[in-house]
Amino acid sequence: MDNVIFNYYSKITGLNVSRETCNELESLISMILEKNKQINIISKKTCEKDAVRERHIIDSAQIIDFVDLNSNTTTDLGTGGGMPGLIVAIIMKKLKNSMKINLYEKSYHKCVFLKEVSKKLKLNTEVIQKDIFKINNIETGTVMSRAFKPMPIILNLVSCLLYTSPSPRDCQW
């Protein structure tokens, strides 16, 4: 692996990212760019490797400091192309943490992509093809999302999902 690329990943604070993790992140980038030719995984404006590293990978990896490492699961709401969920799963693998990352996405095509990536990189994920707004509750240690919905909607959604509302209709979006 190119030292420039390895040094680039050193921006991920406090993780001492291994070459193996860097290789997996680079594989993820290649898969994103390839699949993006067919379906909209990321914006066309950020379709170059350096832009994907900075705008998506490094940005998504910042959440790792807030993930409850003692929990069995972490949930990514409206994961889209897998950010931040796939990045967290790659980092968890490096940390030898057995936490499962639940990836909620309603798009069939994106779910197929997420499953392919998870299988190829041997990530501990579960891809759940459902509209998160139609789910009554979830059990998870950490909830994360990126570029999903405005913050007030996310906070209301999380409040309803974690505190077992009798019905999604009881919550207001």
Where are these regions (language model features)?
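Class I SAM-dependent transferase core
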Residues: 4, 8-69, 120
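Conserved SAM/SAH cofactor-binding pocket of Class I
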Residues: 61-139, 145
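Short glycine-/acidic-enriched loop or helix-start segments at secondary-structure transitions
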Residues: 86, 154-155
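Hydrophobic pocket-lining residues within nucleotide cofactor-binding pockets
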Residues: 132, 148, 168
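A short SAM/SAH-binding and catalytic strip from SAM-dependent methyltransferases
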Residues: 142-152
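A short glycine-rich, Lys/Arg-flanked "PGG" loop and its adjoining helix->strand segment in the class I
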Residues: 155-162
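Single conserved hydrophobic/aromatic residue that forms the stacking wall/gate
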Residues: 163-173
